[in-house]
Amino acid sequence: MKKMAFIDMEGVLIPELWKHFSTVLNIPELAITTREVADYKSLMKFRINLLKENNIPLKKLVGLIKEIDASPNAKEFLEHLKNNKKFEVKIISDCFYELLDPFFDQLNLPIDNAYCHNFEINSNGYIENVIYNRNKGKHEIIVDYQKKKVPLKNSIAIGDAFNDFTMLHLVDHGFLFQPSEEVSKNSPFYFHKVESYQEIIQYLTNNRVA
């Protein structure tokens, strides 16, 4: 059985989408992310209300997504994990299928290997609510694998924000990728803080996680 690599999308493999929306739409409050706010559900209620107040439907956001590319070398990093290090890559993201669709193609990731959320859209095309893939946190996905007796020895997890902490706790090797000062300051000492994909690859090689 391949080892598992549980990886976040925004801030790790792709840019922070809401920061892009904030800049293009000129709504500074949309730039707030889980690097600053730990309570994701409260953050999403705040974002949805902002979009409604500014009359921004989902199709507007989807159009803006087309302007964004995955992070440089992200695809090559994933291919290296899969082909050279023999990891099975699983995406665990608090983003939404409706926004991530173009990136699955860019990164050569099967959508079946992703655990994301969905938007609930009203008849006028505006985001009304969130249909959550899980209730408590990203760790729930890993716990499900544990319950199914899937071998997770030497598995890794990569995230960048507070909402990634719970999944990083459950693997042998947890990486914080380019964390903010606030996230870094409040993270457990045993999380590995890295600034590049190459640092992760080097760590896996040096520690023979292959």
Where are the regions that the model predicts?
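Alpha-helical substrate-recognition element adjacent to the catalytic core
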Residues: 2-116
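Substrate-recognition "cap/lid" segment bordering the active-site pocket of phosphatases
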Residues: 101-155
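Short, charged, surface-exposed secondary-structure boundary motifs
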Residues: 122-128, 184-192, 202-207
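Short, acidic/turn-prone active-site loops that include or flank metal/cofactor-
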Residues: 114-121, 179-183, 196-200
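Acidic, Mg2+-coordinating phosphoryl-transfer loop and its flanking beta/alpha structural elements
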Residues: 93-94, 153-195
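Well-ordered alpha-helical segments embedded in enzymatic catalytic cores
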Residues: 73-76, 141-144, 199
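Short, Lys/Arg-enriched, disordered terminal segments
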Residues: 1-2, 204-210
